[in-house]
């Protein structure tokens, strides 16, 4: 499949720059994958599509305020996006980072001294004379939420709440699992009261999710691995539920990557125990992939030429998805992280 199939034209005024004041009042495009039928609903009406005995699986990862503003000795500012902690010692803590430019040398973050370095496998910041907990405190106090570049404004204090799901609890992501942003606690309670089983997994969203595809053939794209955890009892429950004819609703492409990465054996074990599967997956889901767990997908509208859009094409016939996107654009849906949602069922 050629990368051009993932391209489409989006008016810039449809890129949501801020969230709605009420999470569950966003619009919901329902796409029936067998027939191609499209419905236009409000997100809180999603409860009508869930039946007693179905499982709704959410990603409980929490976004860290991973964007830091540092100062060079010259007084110039440099913006740093923290990717993940690589190692720490009694004196130094090292994080993988992304920045504009290739500056190497000392930087100052508040009263703390750090050093930016390049090597053959990436770009790093070394926090000197600091422990890992102290660095994490610095991030929480001085960091900004890592809003995507298509949001053309500076992060504000309210983004710390808005760019976070109401059920986020496991620190580790540098981007939100955006499909989950539409749920309120009240909506989840309503869903549970209907007899739907709410279950959690963790997948820490990293560069792998939003890294652009730069090859012409999708098959040649390589995903960066992302860490996940799944309770072993959930896997048993999933297979029992599916055998009973009930459905698995996955909230977002990140939840889906964890579930299908595990089910496909496309993961590297990271210390699984008697209770949890712990691993990292670099699975890339694109058309012709055979889904083993997920029956219904809740997701946002994705960027052109992106890996999440490739997953959506894999989950539902490409031409049906393209038609749904065209209709969403015609009807003025809001796109991307703070935008509206789709249910593919």
UniProtKB/Swiss-Prot annotation:
Pfam families according to UniProt: Queuosine_synth (PF02547)
SUPFAM superfamilies, sorted: QueA-like
EC number of the protein: 2.4.99.17
Pathway assigned to this chain's UniProt record: tRNA modification; tRNA-queuosine biosynthesis
Any one cellular-component term (Gene Ontology): cytoplasm
Family in the record: Belongs to the QueA family.
Protein's recorded name: S-adenosylmethionine:tRNA ribosyltransferase-isomerase
Organism: Thermodesulfovibrio yellowstonii (strain ATCC 51303 / DSM 11347 / YP87)
The encoding gene: queA
